Amino acid sequence: MSEKIYPIPDNIKKNALIDEETYQQWYQESINDPESFWAKHGQCIEWFKPYTKVKNTSFNGDVSIQWYEDGITNVAYNCIDRHLKTHGDKIALIWEGDNPYHDKKITYNELYEHVCRFANILKNHGVKKGDKVTIYLTMIPEAAYAMLACARIGAIHSVIFAGFSPEAIAGRIVDCESTFIITANQGLRGGKQINLKDSVDHAIEIAARQNVHVDQVMVIRRTCGPIHWVEGRDFWYHEEVSHTKTDCPAEKMNAEDPLFILYTSGSTGKPKGVLHTTAGYLVYASMTHKYVFDYHAGEIYWCTADIGWITGHSYLVYGPLCNAATTLMFEGTPTFPDNGRFWEIVDKHQVNIFYTAPTAIRALMGAGNSFVERSKRTSLRLLGSVGEPINPEAWEWFYHTVGNNHCPILDTWWQTETGGHMITPLPGATPLKAGSATRPFFGVQLQIIDAEGNVLEGETEGNLCIIDSWPGQMRTLYNDHERFIQTYFSTYKGKYFTGDGCRRDSDGYYWITGRVDDILNVSGHRLGTAEIESALVSHPAVSEAAVVGYPHTIKGQGIYSFITLMEGTAPSEELHQELIRHVRKEIGSIAILDKVQFAPQLPKTRSGKIMRRILRKIAENNFDNLGDISTLSEPQVIDDLIANRQNREITA
């Protein structure tokens, strides 16, 4: 296959931190002598007690991952305190509100005071090292303060995206046994108010029925909206922050002390609590941010991700601040008040590096070029893509229309579990191909493997595995190490299985082809099909449900549901809409059923297993070759499913 290659622009090549020769040299060193390589690069953060041990990892047996295990440091200290002498007056955080007329600029000195005050409030309310703190906030500066305050005192934060339902919030509270929640009365997004506190109150009631009791709720006042209040449990942040001390010593944290738990969808339905620890994570977040974005002092860097996702953790908060960068946080959406908002912000704040998701790119591409062309965007130097594979058409539009043909696009592949970038171009070292994540980052050893476990060489396609550890790797699933082993290390023994399919071309470039397990990637958000199916069958009208993904021009993947109703229940448009609302209520606003097909029966094997492979083909409108259907118990079911498919506008 021949793809157009975009060479490295001269202006990038001239000033890049990493060129092609350095990439090759460092990569070989990182693979051949990882101990030495990571010993050297572990010095990118400051240590209270230096490490003498670097790498102690095994992907076999009980699976154990430790990096810098005898070192002592603190994440908040590295993200704030160490910059104060030389960068105290530098802008650390630019906040752009949902309202285009609202913004704030916070220096490193001011960030230090905000975080110390926040940390002291937590301590005054009994939060201590090792406690779990749930954060349910929209994109306001206090969300970053909360994360950094937890890191400062050694509390473990669990940030939940402020779009998840009370049921989803409760599940996460119960799983990590969190008794302290930080939220706001309301949030603002896209000109709409989101009732955060109401969702938290409901979640607390659900958690209590499962014997997990939330003792304290800190509430940030974002709007003047009404609020339900529980005396003795709830307290206002603004009432305490004004008379709290502006100094709080950073807790001495062992390198392997937990930093945060972040929940991601699992194929069994129950979300997985991905656990990241202190030092290895920060070293990797800092290093990938610096070299992938070729970050130079003084640049304005904007990652549009929400703090509820790993991208917001690694590349909005921890990575940039560890590198003394100026990071921009945006409260709103790309389409409010109109489709030009992103580009107006780029001009307003003179953004140099812009990192967003293919879903946003496709939506804005669909809105037409006029919204882009009314802005200048001359400050832009680099563009980035994250969350899902970017299709070549969107890549080309991003490059030519947004980047004016001169901004390299950093198409980054990584996961919640990996902590940071795994396959990515480096601006000064990597010629680009539209739609390819290109080459592995330092220390990342990739293998493509077939279904039988054979390693495939050269130009090929198969399942993507990683054969050795890296510092940013998750350590376990919270309270479920056995599930951690089974999920990631049992498919191919001694290897981390990513769950993604991958193609390697003749130039050694990698192309991610999508999930090979039962996880959907909807607008860059991972949703488990089992989780959606469980939500559907919890409705009294639903007997059985199967959920698959299908190609969606904006979201990348859409959610297609096949539903069998209870005896005596007839399909109707009213029920169709009710089921859409029901799933949103159970999981959250990101789980919108795009296609609902009522079916008298689902295709099953003789042992009763639903043949999702066939349903995927039908959902993709690709039913001419359904493959082997000899194991179907009732083959005639297929004809009905094809005749009543809901996706006729899709071309195969």
UniProtKB/Swiss-Prot annotation:
Residues noted as binding ATP in the record, renumbered to the chain: 387-389, 411-416, 500, 515, 526
GO cellular component: cytosol
Modified residues annotated as N6-acetyllysine in this record: 609
The keyword ATP-binding belongs to this UniProt entry's keyword annotation: yes
EC number assigned by the record: 6.2.1.1
Residues reported in the UniProt entry to bind CoA: 189-192, 311, 523, 584
Pfam families, per the entry: ACAS_N, AMP-binding, AMP-binding_C
Catalytic activity: acetate + ATP + CoA = acetyl-CoA + AMP + diphosphate
GO biological process: acetyl-CoA biosynthetic process from acetate
UniProt PTM comment: Acetylated. Deacetylation by the SIR2-homolog deacetylase activates the enzyme.
Binding site for Mg(2+): 537, 539, 542
Leading EC class: ligase
Keywords per UniProt: Acetylation, ATP-binding, Ligase, Magnesium, Metal-binding, Nucleotide-binding
Gene Ontology molecular function, alphabetical: acetate-CoA ligase activity; AMP binding; ATP binding; metal ion binding
Cofactor(s) demanded: Mg(2+)
UniProt record similarity statement: Belongs to the ATP-dependent AMP-binding enzyme family.
Alphabetical list of HAMAP family matching this protein: Ac_CoA_synth
Role noted for this protein: Catalyzes the conversion of acetate into acetyl-CoA (AcCoA), an essential intermediate at the junction of anabolic and catabolic pathways. AcsA undergoes a two-step reaction. In the first half reaction, AcsA combines acetate with ATP to form acetyl-adenylate (AcAMP) intermediate. In the second half reaction, it can then transfer the acetyl group from AcAMP to the sulfhydryl group of CoA, forming the product AcCoA.
Protein name, per record: Acetyl-coenzyme A synthetase
UniProt source species: Bartonella henselae (strain ATCC 49882 / DSM 28221 / CCUG 30454 / Houston 1) (Rochalimaea henselae)
Name of the coding gene: acsA
